[in-house]
Amino acid sequence: MDPQPPPPAQGSPPHRGRGRGRGRGRGRGRGRGRGGAGAPRAPLPCPTCGRLFRFPYYLSRHRLSHSGLRPHACPLCPKAFRRPAHLSRHLRGHGPQPPLRCAACPRTFPEPAQLRRHLAQEHAGGEVELAIERVAKETAEPSWGPQDEGSEPPTTAAAGATEEEAVAAWPETWPAGEPSTLAAPTSAAEPRESESEEAEAGAAELRAELALAAGRQEEKQVLLQADWTLLCLRCREAFATKGELKAHPCLRPEGEQEGEGGPPPRPKRHQCSICLKAFARPWSLSRHRLVHSTDRPFVCPDCGLAFRLASYLRQHRRVHGPLSLLAPLPAAGKKDDKASGARNSAKGPEGGEGAECGGASEGGEGQNGGDAAPARPPAGEPRFWCPECGKGFRRRAHLRQHGVTHSGARPFQCVRCQREFKRLADLARHAQVHAGGPAPHPCPRCPRRFSRAYSLLRHQRCHRAELERAAALQALQAQAPTSPPPPPPPLKAEQEEEGLPLPLANIKEEPPSPGTPPQSPPAPPVFLSASCFDSQDHSAFEMEEEEVDSKAHLRGLGGLAS
């Protein structure tokens, strides 16, 4: 029997008085006990080795090393461990674990964390605790993986069967190692058949309760397969691209699918006079008319390309780099056509989604004499509002995409890692993790690569100063030929006539005559500081008479400055 730890010193708080421990209130009451304000916590020594610990939990965990107890045994080999974390880490060495089965649906998961997340997302509400209880009962059965539907768990022959017979009847579900006797079932008072029947009854009850709330829960619709195709789980049809999957009728919202008794489609009263294509909304016709017109009012200031919509121009300007995106969009040119002027005035920055056609805006009727179109908000204002949080959107598709955040459903699942996503775009972006290889968006100025184009644009802000310097240098180089050239230096004859001193580069030394002795190189110049002239003794600077006369002669000729 292990000796009990000594009682804490006087003035130190007991273990239950530590407050929240590692929570937010950890720094408030640290080191303050009931004995006095600011009293330090007394360390707790180990009675066996004398090691000091700050908290009783650390001391009790340390005392397991002296006791030799290993309560967490491995069910596959004779090894045992002191902590459950060590056991879970050891189980990974036996190979992949069999999947865990959900008690409410036939889905399986390789990790307990994924099963808990599935229960919280799919079977949310009051059914989560019941589902966890069913899972705990099923995982407590002999085998870790899901049993066949027709098979029943093994039972002991009699209540008084020996432990060896129970171990022999225990099925071996793992290829590596043999189950230890600690994990084998012993003779229990209640038969195992009653437990399995109770678990099945609870699972059936849970499925019945979840069926009532199936109307507000979205089922899994799309699955990313191993061959990178998108599989529709409703009709089992695979698609190669995301656009083909979105056009699939199974992914349409409720009420818009054919034959489901939803609201009737809006009549298409607005018809194009050129191709006879009809539209249900006037602004859809206005946007369609741009296909037939040659009017391209949005011109790129960098390369001169013209576009029909401002959104097309904004997407094109990414080619010219981040500096082009920082500049404002140029305004559309003024047109004499009345219809185009009405379109440009009502179009707004998005370029056509909220623009009305000229005929519908001038008159009070539609294109073919229908009823007047309802008054629409100004361009850029939200038209669709979320009933849950009141957030506004300009497009109905954005409102549908936002509704997933309130439902909590994740209808898009990756088949490789069982990870779930709210949007199809997130699933397609996640596929790059399994594809491997370099990211598709490299930075042109550094070796970094990014998986998203937006991340690359955000990263290029770091090179903004460098790009601005390069742009300024290019501007200076472009302006250099236009500046007047510097005046040429005056000629030698002009300088001699004006009496100006010639530069040293233009003075040529005459070669010495053959009979003259070689001259010594000129002495280096001597520089005197101002402190030399502050001395009272000027004898060192007295010059001889010949030297004074020569200097006076030069000064008279103008060659020496006075």
Swiss-Prot record:
Modified residues (Phosphoserine): 194, 196, 483
One GO BP: regulation of transcription by RNA polymerase II
Keyword Transcription attributed: yes
Bias type Basic residues, positions: 15-33
Residue ranges of the region described as Disordered: 1-43, 139-203, 327-379, 477-562
Subcellular location, principal: nucleus
UniProt-annotated location(s): Nucleus
Keyword Repeat: yes
Similarity remark: Belongs to the krueppel C2H2-type zinc-finger protein family.
Protein name as annotated: Zinc finger protein 579
The organism of origin for this protein: Homo sapiens (Human)
Organism placement in taxonomy: Eukaryota, Metazoa, Chordata, Craniata, Vertebrata
